């Protein structure tokens, strides 16, 4: 581990020199590449430097204790030594996490798809609740949300809603939201006060660059038709809605929220690229699944990941056994505690795997 950290520190110093070199600064593209590489390893190098400083302070304190000291001063040094050793352990644990391989998609924007599952209109209302929850969380994080396509219902829910979230590190925090979300509550239409259970499925796809997914135009069938609103009525007379079918995989994407056919086609292609990239990623992960099954979950769309119980004001994440009795706050976008716990568990699982392979 420390050989790797020494190499990273050397690389960091070299990059620091390069980004200050007038010759490099003159070549904008090259300079930006070095700045990005420098920023990527800055945190780990700073933590490593603090670790080395702490180790030196421990050695100094131990040397002092070998000398003849008056009792009060000896006690002070021993107390400081104890704190320094605790700090060393904390920094070492942090370095191990920082050395874990980064998910190449972590810094990407995402395309999220929420679909109402079992439960009819109640499931559609729950899909709407989830969309608002994620929108509010994105707002707290300073991210931007844009609806790509939606199929609203008369009561204000969604049969399906597809939207993008753009900002710093979106995928790294949203990737564990994929799966089946379950709601337990008394519907407003229920006169007997019985609790109903409904579900909605969430898919989180990292946005795919055009260069990452090659699509042969001959593999596409593109249909245009009139857009329809809630209840199925046609909302305009022009054929602005677009349906794209990717023939080799059978993936179908429909976009109708924009008035322009060109914009709907552009959005549909963006969703198609993300779905194709996600399909390739899922196939790759299925091959690795026998070697490693993460406790946080497989990201399998059919995996029930979380229950939202309204009568008890409770939300439970089944993957990590976390229960919070503040569902109202969670639905207002207060998701950090759940997301942080999922990230911590995933890191612990990956560390265990690294230690097991060591």
Swiss-Prot record:
Q: Which UniProt keywords apply?
A: Cytoplasm, Methylation, Protein biosynthesis
Which stretches does the entry tag as region Disordered? 286-309
**How does it get modified after it is made?**
Methylated by PrmC. Methylation increases the termination efficiency of RF1.
Write one Gene Ontology MF term.
translation release factor activity, codon specific
Classification via Pfam families: PCRF, RF-1
Q: Name one GO cellular component term.
A: cytoplasm
UniProt keyword Repeat, yes or no:
no
Where is the PTM N5-methylglutamine found along the chain? 233
Q: What protein family is recorded?
A: Belongs to the prokaryotic/mitochondrial release factor family.
Q: Which NCBIfam families match?
A: prfA (TIGR00019), PRK00591.1 (NF001859)
Q: What protein name applies here?
A: Peptide chain release factor 1
